[in-house]
Every structure is written in structure tokens, then in C-alpha cells.
Amino acid sequence: MLALISPAKTLDYESTLPTDKHTLPRLLDQSQALIDYCRSLSASEIASLMSVSEKIAKLNAERFQDWTSELTLANARQAIFAFKGDVYTGLDAYHLQENDFEFAQKHLRMLSGLYGLLRPLDLMMPYRLEMGTKLHNSRGHNLYEFWDDRITRLINEDLEQTNSKILVNIASDEYYKSVKEQKINAQIVKPVFLDQKNGKYKVISFYAKKARGLMARFIIENKLENAEDLKAFNSEGYYFDLENSNQHELVFKRDEQA
């Protein structure tokens, strides 16, 4: 089993790292090409392109200039600890055990606008470059065209190396769109998380993001290999909804708290 999650805009480069074990991203030459494009942008152009404030644009212009492919623990940190959004609150990587990291390194992947596909212990410098960014480049007008099938090929390599027959899509639509689904050499399963509100079950973004992280943690802690085992997921009140699920989409519901 190989699980895909999205990165986060919020980053943490302050907390004490629980391990110094690390690896390097495998598509750094592609990252360098993207950085070269980004370095040509002014802060105001970045603000317009990314729809961010001038302050955030200036910070990221500086990050693009400072970026290097010579990654070390002195200038970077492992992706699983660097990301800090709702998904990573659910994942809670800082409280995983040593053997969990070994499993995660083989069975969890983070999609990334800048790095393409990250393993948990791959080092990364702070950046902001969302997959949906319409960054003009030599391969097209956006990052989907830039990455083309490179991310997909690497996913297939990982599936083969881990003898995985299942790809679990717990990434956002924006990031999963970078995967050429028809070229994936595995059964694809997508967990969907519905929360009850005013008597109706629906996807509530904040809860769904955290639930994706909880599912990633569930897979890692239980060393899951089969899609059937995902149905046992019951973190924080979620339960499997057999009636509304099928072999491609597993629905999990959580009832409204009184």
C-alpha cells in the first residue's frame, strides 16, 4: 500500500526534530528548474501569481533566492516535520515511533508543487508553490504541465519497489490532479470523510483535511497493506459507511456531537 497526501502552506522549522535520519528528494533537478523560473519573478509578480500579500510575496521571493539543492539539516528539515497544516495535525508525526518512520518512508508520499513527490524523511527548504499555480515554464502554462507524468512514474517505481497493489488517495483534488491516474499500476482507493451538520452528512474542509492525516497515521501505525483493512479506521469518532462505499471510494462518517 502506498498513500498520497498533500503538503501544507503552514511550515514548522522551529520544533525540535525527533530524529536526524534523512534522505534527499529524488527530483531535485526538476526543482532547480522551477526555482530558476521563480527567481525571475519580482515580489509583486509573486503576489499576483499566488494571490498572496506583498509581505508573503517578499518572503517567498527571498526563499527562492536562498534555495539550494545542497540540502542539509542545517538549512532544511524532513518534509514530515516541516509541514504543519490540518492534515499534519491529524498525522501528528512528532509522536510516531521509530519503526513507524521506517514504514512511512516506504508507504507514505507527499505531493509537492516544488519537489514533485516527497518521502517523509526527504529534506526540504521552506517554500510556497502550490500545485495549482499557473507558473509559465518551458513545458507549459502551469505546474501540471511542468510535472507531466514525472510524478506518476516515480509513484509507479515506489509501488513496484514496495510490492504495493493499492494506491490510497488522501490528497486534495488540487494535488491529486498531478497524478496521471490512468497510468498508475495499482488499484486506486479514495477515502471520503463526511461530518454531520444540521442532520446532513457532508465534506467539511477543516475536518476532512485533519481526517486525511488521521487516516495516514492509521495506515502507518497499523502497517496496513490491504484496502479491506482501511475500513477499520475509527479515529476521533469516524466509522465506515458500507452502504455508500464501493471498491474505489470508501466513505467514513462522523455523527454530530450533542
Curated annotation (Swiss-Prot):
Domain of life: Bacteria
GO terms under cellular component: cytosol
Pfam families: H2O2_YaaD (PF03883)
InterPro entries according to UniProt: YaaA
GO biological process: response to hydroperoxide
NCBIfam families to which the protein is assigned, alphabetical: PRK02101.1-1, PRK02101.1-3
Stated family: Belongs to the UPF0246 family.
HAMAP family noted in UniProt: UPF0246
Protein name: UPF0246 protein ACIAD2218
